[in-house]
């Protein structure tokens, strides 16, 4: 009986290896990076930006509070997103990547002890889309559970 099982296993292995030697194209084609986004941008955070994300907001952790309206700066360089809340004097750095098809992915904090959008219970990662027209960059949250990051990043940014 065990010899019969062995033979069946060997035959199954051979059958699995049968087929064309041609490589099938991948289901998705890789997109290229979007180096044209590199640079420094500015925008103003408004009351409307903050109110738009109130349904996501949880400021229950120590030292957490809503952002205040005011000037923001955004730097995009070599996989690093740097956002500065000028009025609060807070700078936050996160990994990011952008592709030519408009995907904008935000990864881990680079120095969470120096600044973070949300507390440790909120995922660090997020998915946005981007569009650029001339010197204007528009970011829009697709999936972001952090209200403060969404309030701050979603909107039109002017290149400086």
Model segments located where?
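Bacterial N-terminal signal peptides that target proteins for export
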Residues: 1-6
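Extracellular/mature segments of secreted proteins
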Residues: 26, 124-129, 152-159
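Short, low-complexity, disordered segments immediately C-terminal to signal peptides
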Residues: 19-38
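Tryptophan-anchored aromatic micro-motifs
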Residues: 33-66, 157-159
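Contiguous, well-ordered beta-strand patches that form the walls/edges
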Residues: 47-53, 58, 66-70, 74-144
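C-terminal motif of bacterial Sec signal peptides marking the signal peptidase cleavage site
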Residues: 14-17
């Amino acid at each position: 009986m065990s010899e019969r099982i062995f033979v069946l296993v060997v035959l199954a292995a051979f059958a699995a290896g049968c087929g064309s030697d041609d490589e099938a194209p991948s289901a998705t084609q890789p997109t290229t990076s979007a180096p044209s986004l590199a640079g420094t941008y500015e925008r103003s955070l408004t009351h409307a930006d903050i109110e738009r994300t109130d349904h996501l907001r949880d400021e229950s952790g120590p030292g957490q509070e809503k952002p205040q309206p005011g000037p923001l700066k955004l730097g995009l360089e070599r996989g690093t997103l740097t956002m500065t809340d000028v009025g609060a004097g807070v700078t936050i750095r996160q990994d990011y990547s952008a592709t030519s098809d408009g995907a904008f992915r935000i990864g881990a904090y680079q120095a969470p002890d120096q600044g973070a959008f949300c507390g440790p219970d909120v995922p660090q990662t997020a998915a946005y889309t981007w569009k650029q027209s001339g010197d204007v960059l528009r970011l829009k949250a697709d999936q972001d559970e952090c209200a403060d990051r969404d309030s701050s990043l979603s909107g039109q940014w002017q290149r400086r």
